[in-house]
Amino acid sequence: MPRGFLVKRTKRTGGLYRVRLAERVFPLLGPQGAPPFLEEAPSASLPGAERATPPTREEPGKGLTAEAAREQSGSPCRAAGVSPGTGGREGAEWRAGGREGPGPSPSPSPSPAKPAGAELRRAFLERCLSSPVSAESFPGGAAAVAAFSCSVAPAAAPTPGEQFLLPLRAPFPEPALQPDPAPLSAALQSLKRAAGGERRGKAPTDCASGPAAAGIKKPKAMRKLSFADEVTTSPVLGLKIKEEEPGAPSRGLGGSRTPLGEFICQLCKEQYADPFALAQHRCSRIVRVEYRCPECDKVFSCPANLASHRRWHKPRPAAANAATVSSADGKPPSSSSSSSRDSGAIASFLAEGKENSRIERTADQHPQARDSSGADQHPDSAPRQGLQVLTHPEPPLPQGPYTEGVLGRRVPVPGSTSGGRGSEIFVCPYCHKKFRRQAYLRKHLSTHEAGSARALAPGFGSERGAPLAFACPLCGAHFPTADIREKHRLWHAVREELLLPALAGAPPETSGPSGPSDGSAQQIFSCKHCPSTFFSSPGLTRHINKCHPSESRQVLLLQMPLRPGC
C-alpha cells in the first residue's frame, strides 16, 4: 500500500472553555492570585440589608459625594488612564482576601453604595456576556464591562504594585483600540498553526522519498462537460433533433382534463396520462438522418458505415474493364442480340457484389462476350449455360427449362411497367433451384463441380478461350466435365416428353422450370455417385451422407437405367 494512503486524523478540536472574567482582566497573574468570580463578588460583599433592599434612585447625593471624594483622592483610573477592570468594592475585597489568605469574608467596605442605575446596567451586561456564545463572539466584552463598572462606580485606589501589574488598557469611551484576544484562544490557534505547518512541511518530503518520486501526482484535469448541444443531439445513431420553432405553441391533451402524472415529452412538450403512451409517442422534432449510397441507393444511419460500404464498389470498375478486355481479345460477340444480353447478365452477376444485386442493369451497359458454352452451338440448340434471373410471375410464365434465351437473362413480368422493379429470383443453371439473393446462389454454385463455375465465367484463367470437350449427343450442348454431361442426359431421360416439343420449336406445355402445371412431374435430384434420384434436396443430402461417405465415394457414369432412391 503506498505511503500516505491511510491518513490518520490526529487533529482534534479543542474543548469549549468559559474564560473567567478575572483571567481576561488580569492575564499576567498566575492561578494562585486569580480573583474570585465577579458574579459572586457583589453578592458576597454586600451586607444582607443591601441585598434585600431593592435598587432605587433615592440617593443621588451619595453618588455625587463619592465622585467628589474620588476626584480629591486622585483616582488611579483617571490619573493613569487605565481601567482597573472591576469596581472599587470588588477590588478592595480581593486585596483584603489576598493579604489575609483564606478565611471568613471581610467586613463590608465603608465606601458609599453604588447607584441603582449603574447596578442594573452592570448586572444586565454581566448576564449577557457570561454565556460562552457571547464570550466567544465578543472577546472584549469582559473588559468593556470592567471599564464600564469603573467609570460608573469607582473604588479606592489600588496599591502601586497592583497598579504596575494591571494591563495598560484604553478607557471605555475610546473605540479605536480593541482589547487583546483571550490567551487560551490565542494558544490554541498557535498550536493549530504549528501543526498545520508541520503537516505541510512533511508532505513534499514524503512524496520525494516514495517509490514514485520521479513522477509526482498531478491533479486530474476535470473534463468540462458541455451541455450546449443537449437539445440538438440525439443519443440514437441516425437520429437528429430539430431546433424548436420559436412560434410553435406547446401541444397538450385535448380538453381541460389534467394528466394523471407528469409524463411530458421534453422536446415537444406534449403531455400524456401514462408512461406507455409517452413511450409510444413519436416526437415531431426527431428526424431520421439518411446516408444514401450514390451507386446502389442503400441507406445507412452512419457516415462511417456508408464509407465502409462504398469500398465494395471500388473493385467493380476494374472487374468490368477486365471483362471488357477479355471480350475484346477473346471470341467476337454474337450477331444475335439475345445472346449478348444473356452473356451480359452472366458477366454482371460475377463482377458485381451483393450490395448491387437489386439494381436494374441496362442491356447495353458493359457489353460482354458470349458464353463459351454456346460458342459452338447452333441457334436451335439448347440449353445455354448461364444464370437465369427471373421476376416473380403472377400468374407463372409458361416456359420450358431448357428453351432458348430463358437461362441467363431477366424475364419481365407481364403487365408491369418497364421502369418498375419487382422482386427477383435467381435460378441455378444445373439443378434449377431458385434463390432470392445472389449470395445464396453463389453459395449453392460452390456445391456443384468446379468446372461448372468455370463454364459460367467466360474469362476464367487458362480456360477462357478453350472449347468445352463434353457435348450432349441428344441436344449438342457442351459441358466442362463428364459428370455434368451425364446429369444433363439424366434430365433428358426424365423429361423427354417435355424437352422434345421445346427442341422442335413447339410452345412448351409446362408452367415453369419445375414441371407441368398439374403437378404430376416434380423436380428430381439425382445422386452423382449412383443412379438414385430424389424429389428433394434434403433427401439427396441424407442419401449421400448415408450411402456415400467421403472415403468411399467414387464417380460413376450414369449410363444405367433409373431406379428409385433408397
Swiss-Prot record:
Location(s) in or outside the cell: Cytoplasm; Nucleus
Region (Disordered): 32-117, 310-418
Region feature SNAG domain, mapped onto this chain: 1-20
Record's keyword terms, sorted: Cytoplasm, DNA-binding, Metal-binding, Nucleus, Repeat, Transcription, Transcription regulation, Zinc, Zinc-finger
Pfam annotation, one family: zf-C2H2
InterPro entries in the record: INSM1/2, Znf_C2H2_sf, Znf_C2H2_type
One annotated GO molecular function: DNA-binding transcription repressor activity, RNA polymerase II-specific
Zinc-finger ranges (C2H2-type): 263-283, 291-313, 426-448, 470-492, 525-548
Tissue expression pattern: Expressed in heart, liver, skeletal muscle, kidney and pancreas, and, to a lesser extent, in brain, lung and spleen. In the pancreas, expressed in islet cells, including insulin- and glucagon-producing alpha- and beta-cells, but not in acinar cells (at protein level). Detected in adrenal glands, particularly in the deeper layer of the cortex (at protein level).
Record's compositionally biased regions (Pro residues): 103-113
Compositional bias ranges of the Low complexity kind: 318-348
A GO CC term assigned to this protein in UniProt: cytoplasm
Start-end of Basic and acidic residues biased regions: 352-369
GO biological process, one term: regulation of cell cycle process
Role: May function as a growth suppressor or tumor suppressor in liver cells and in certain neurons.
Protein name, UniProt field: Insulinoma-associated protein 2
Species assigned in the record: Homo sapiens (Human)
